[in-house]
Amino acid sequence: MDSTTITSISQVDQNNNQNNEQNNQNESSEQSLRENLDFFQNVIDANSNFDFDREECFTLRYDDTCQNIAAGYSTGTLGIYNMEKPEESQDYKKSYNISTFPITCLRWKPYNKTTIILVTAEGYILQVHSKSGKILQEIIEENNPLMCVDYSLDGMLFATGGNDKYVRLYDDNTKTLIKKLERHRYDLPEHSNRIFAVKFSKKDPNLLLSGGWDNTILLYDIRSREVSNYLYGPHICGDGMDLKDDLLLTVSWEKEDQIQLFDLRMNKKIGVFQMNIKENNNENNKNKLDNVSYLYSCRFNPSNNTFCVTGSNKNYLRIYDYNNLNCDNITEERIKAIRDLNDLKHPCYCCDYNIKGNKLVYGSAKTKIDFLNLI
């Protein structure tokens, strides 16, 4: 039986009253969970230990109005940024202490201006009211640190993925688990490592995708609730998968072939690209690893034929133009880098465009989020 616990808002209030009695047990449980999160340091930086006291932005999203940005931090803080207010205003940012563990992924609920769903490295799924910080609903996937969550286009379903290698599909109305998605054909693979990205298709309401550390993208049919196909290649270590119509974009935490494109109509990889970073030819840059950006996140611009990728090591954000992407065998010459932010001071973990496509927000290993105007 799948170990998933669901709690309503009234139950949340009751549980809060019992917290003091459970502190000793919680401290022991929390320490155990923190020890089990050693893998998370590899996601954050290949050469540094995880620091629970340093506030880093792991996930962020514009809402559909372009007025608000939700950002999740390593300290368990949820930040809501009001784009209609000046940055120096007290109303520009509201902060809510949601969890003692990192918020690893979040999404705004479709057709709802005030509800955010987020997941934590402790295994919690929380729905939060953006204007008050009140927890509306909580679900716990016990002993399963969660890395990703996504809503279906109509907001009726959401899916999660994490440490235990399974994608779970939930009914948003009842907040109940529909099914832990598995394969039913042995000629198809299943995930053999942690899942870092889940994505519902906006074009096909019956299509859901997942990817992670096992270099495999699984495709699920929502109607049969099972694996229907797969793609091989990307080593995903963050919000590193995006869809636009039939085009799938992925980025990898690898030193080579970090950007891969797939055509879902043919279930075929159509492009593999190296994240080349030009450096001055000097003694400090003879090691090729110095010129590599290990990528975490990617996003299609909703209004034109560009996409953004972000990464670490060489802390980088780059925007590509794929306007000439009209053939089955795409070469690097057909994908043009049109804008770079190179040698950022901190690893860049996440990015998002507003719905108009004229602004890009990105988050990194520092508290403040940053913007690019794209006009």
List the predicted regions and their residue ranges.
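WD40-repeat beta-propellers
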Residues: 78-83, 125-130, 167-172, 217-221, ...
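Conserved strand-to-loop turn within each blade of WD40 beta-propeller repeats
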Residues: 72-75, 119-122, 160-164, 172, ...
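A short helix->beta-strand "capping" segment at the edge of beta-propeller domains
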Residues: 29-55, 88-91, 334-335
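Canonical WD40 repeat/beta-propeller blade segments in eukaryotic WD-repeat proteins
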Residues: 54-61, 98-108, 144-151, 186-200, ...
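Surface loop/turn motifs at the tips and blade-to-blade linkers of beta-strand repeat domains
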Residues: 49-52, 95-98, 139-141, 188-190, ...
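Residue-level detector of Asp-centered blade-edge/turn motifs that repeat once per structural unit
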Residues: 64-65, 110-112, 153-154, 202-204, ...
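Hydrophobic beta-strand positions that form the internal "hydrophobic ladder"
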Residues: 69, 116, 158, 208, ...
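Blade-level signature of beta-propeller repeat domains, shared across WD40, Kelch, NHL, RCC1
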Residues: 350, 354-375
